[in-house]
Amino acid sequence: MMKPQHGGMAGHGGGRTRSPFLTSYALTLAFITFVSVLYFKDFSSTLHQPFLTRPPPHRRQIARPRAPSHHHGGGSSSGGGDVVPPFAVGAAAAAGCDVGVGEWVYDEAARPWYEEEECPYIQPQLTCQAHGRPDTAYQHWRWQPRGCSLPSFNATLMLEMLRGKRMMFVGDSLNRGQYVSLVCLLHRSIPESSKSMETFDSLTVFRAKNYNATIEFYWAPFLAESNSDDAVVHRIADRIVRGTALEKHARFWKGADILVFNSYLWWMTGQKMKILQGSFEDKSKDIVEMETEEAYGMVLNAVVRWVENNMNPRNSRVFFVTMSPTHTRSKDWGDDSDGNCYNQTTPIRDLSYWGPGTSKGLMRVIGEVFSTSKVPVGIVNITQLSEYRKDAHTQIYKKQWNPLTPEQIANPKSYADCTHWCLPGLQDTWNELLYSKLFFP
């Protein structure tokens, strides 16, 4: 501003002699202005964002993660404003919509996502068609939330977002079923020569080599150490949990970018749970009994502490899948009082149905414990929508662990499995919910 003025003064009045005072004043003022400009530029640079070029706040907040790098802060159910969780690629279709509330819609055109024989990773305990199930209707039901829709599962998108990452499921056989379901949903998008699955004791690893990604399952039915930790030989009636000891298992969880926990079925042994104080190697074992809800909360609190100490919410995500219901008494939903899930071919239509085998007390513990976590833990609530699916269990159409007796053969419902689920089927929907929470929170 001063230079034009100073230049004008220099040319004014033709050859008039300049005053030494005016010349000195002009030079001093010009020097001050020059230094001020330099200082302003340096101060702006110090902030790494020049004042006049700072982008609007909303532009900085909605930047989407780029695979494979994820540097966003973690989201939280207790707040977090516009902070985008890691792996998010978009917002939920309808804010405030509870995807766990809705109904099952029969849709032969859109379900199943894959055929049983197309996925070589399904265990024979879950291949219902191969073991003689006469109907396929259980494969064709699509979950429709009330007031919104789930985002369509995109295997290519998920694999791209998992590039260079490690995703791990931790829990029991129901969590393993969900793990296998996810592998089946993804594997067709991976060339045959670029994928593999291996099992190492309690750890199963599926590798998508082109993406340098792994999807893993780790057997830990109680999450804490227990006498049921053998991934194959674990049918123990007298179950004992070693307090809050996670170290044996948790060393395998470290380094995972996405963790998906579950733990419920193995806790359903009665009102009391045996808790070991000390080690399984101790000659004299100190075992106490605790109320199941108290013991369950104790272990989940230990999981929360581990998550807070080991998972960075800026580049990782943690989920907990709620309880999977059973359908062992058909009188619970108004059918023949002597039956169970055997020969059931349609879902329960009563939207208020909640089976007696599903503990609301443990459900409450899940909500209370994970709501205190300093690292966000996403709850994948599969319970209510699964309550309706009395038709989706493996029933008798699976590999049997032991030869059937003549009495069992004469009475199929006596050995029907009303706990586990056929694949493809219900657990694919669980992964649709997980997909929604992971990429469209």
Swiss-Prot record:
Membrane topology, Cytoplasmic segments = 1-19
Q: Name one GO molecular function term.
A: O-acetyltransferase activity
Q: List the disulfide bonds.
A: C97-C148, C119-C184, C128-C422, C341-C418
Residue intervals on the Lumenal side: 41-441
Q: Which UniProt keywords apply?
A: Disulfide bond, Glycoprotein, Golgi apparatus, Membrane, Signal-anchor, Transferase, Transmembrane, Transmembrane helix
Where on this chain is DXXH motif (motif)? Answer: 417-420
Report the principal subcellular site: Golgi
Q: Give the UniProt subcellular location, in the record's own words.
A: Golgi apparatus membrane
Motif interval(s): GDS motif: 171-173
- Report the glycosylation sites: N154, N212, N343, N381
- EC numbers on record: 2.3.1.-
Naturally occurring in which organism (per UniProt): Oryza sativa subsp. japonica (Rice)
**Membrane topology annotation:** Single-pass type II membrane protein
What residue spans carry the region label Disordered?
A: 50-81
Function in brief: Probable xylan acetyltransferase required for 2-O- and 3-O-monoacetylation of xylosyl residues in xylan. Possesses extremely low activity in vitro.
Task: Provide the transmembrane region boundaries.
Answer: 20-40
Q: In which tissues is it expressed?
A: Expressed in roots, leaves and stems.
UniProt GO BP: xylan acetylation
Q: Which PANTHER family match?
A: PROTEIN TRICHOME BIREFRINGENCE-LIKE 33, PROTEIN TRICHOME BIREFRINGENCE-LIKE 9-RELATED
Q: Where is the active site?
A: S173, D417, H420
- The encoding gene is XOAT10
Entry similarity comment: Belongs to the PC-esterase family. TBL subfamily.
Q: Bias category Basic residues: which stretches?
A: 56-73
Q: Which GO terms describe its cellular component?
A: Golgi apparatus; Golgi membrane
Please give the name of this protein.
Probable xylan O-acetyltransferase 10
